[in-house]
């Protein structure tokens, strides 16, 4: 009898991970126990994924606002510092802004509008149209912004982020000036020392600032790249991918995620006798169709993964085969024809640009699988920071 299930994704309940725990040992033992208790046989191509937050927690990869401030002072001189294009998020940016402000005498905050990089809106496009404001040309002061739009409250959080970020800066002991523009160089009339806080466009922002004459250009990925007074750190991503741990600390993106994934994959493969892949995942790369927010506030979906997860899908479009190429067939004859077509597919030859693959998804496997994991585990109280996936690499012919 042929298999009736394809890809199966399971959230695995795990114990609470604590600083100093072995994320590899706990992940592997938890998954093996779940497979045994539920009579699930491991198969070649299975994937074990663990969320980045528990990896960082086990590593003790944290930093305080004062440690951030110390790094800011050392790298900027601590006078007037520009903070360009942060996202609007209490979880992701409020403590980073406090740390930066603690390390400076004045902060010039440049906010993009009508929304931040990931789609959190200050105002709507319709409001811009009504006010006659061109977001690609017009640079607004706080007074001009308030005159045009008044108080702006985020529809989901109920927070006026303009007022909130201004209060954070001032409560940290720095002067605050807020400017609204979509050209990062608009901050240079105010200061030549800039921390650009965008995530996915940060390299371009750094290049534009440097070319326009900024003297000090940093990104969030240039802060906390090494320990500061005993802090955690991330040599590659710095403060990118961090989020609020408590009222004075952020949890940084995990270090050595590739080594963690490889250790989990090897231990699972050794224990099961099957080829098991592994990854460390963070934010999924999906966009909320209602709120218009792109959920990827981490620098990457998956900071670490095993080699079997490199690449993109190389699939045929079954609908095209059934409706076009084999339109005159039906029943078992159609099934056999499609199966033979799939079996004849050269796995090493890309199908990009070929009609039979049109409508499939030419995205990185790690982005697809990591997004699937993030949607499965959620960000609340499910208690499933480990995801076990079976059948992801199967096709219609696999029994």
Ranges and model annotations:
Residues 2-44, 53-399:
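Conserved mixed alpha/beta catalytic, RNA-binding, or beta-rich assembly cores of soluble enzyme
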